[in-house]
UniProtKB/Swiss-Prot annotation:
This is Large ribosomal subunit protein bL19. PANTHER family: LARGE RIBOSOMAL SUBUNIT PROTEIN BL19M, RIBOSOMAL PROTEIN L19. One of its GO terms (cellular component) is cytosolic large ribosomal subunit. Gene3D superfamilies: 2.30.30.790. The keyword Repeat does not apply. This protein is located at the 30S-50S ribosomal subunit interface and may play a role in the structure and function of the aminoacyl-tRNA binding site.
Amino acid sequence: MNLIQTLEQEEISRLNKTIPAYAPGDTVIVSVNVVEGTRKRVQAFEGVVIAKRNRGLNSSFIVRKVSNGEGVERTFQVYSPLIAKIEVKRRGDVRRAKLYYLRSRSGKSARIKEKLGAKAA
């Protein structure tokens, strides 16, 4: 392992964040710390994970939800200090690593089967 990877691993262990096991297709609730002026509050963003990018400290994932008939996607950095917690609500059964095809679908065709036998958090 080279020096940069070693430093990233040390930083990840120093952050001491508990990240649940999640995969594309899972429905997650991401609690985000939002600062508005002097007030700080926690905002929940619930949706389907359509992509996961494993890059050590720079890992990220994209969550998609439909809000008022409009598709909303948000990219989150896994180790960001703005993320309070990640909670897996439902496990999805998919055969792809990237679910970008959900962008062009709506209604029943955009549904994802639930993985049977898997227990959500």
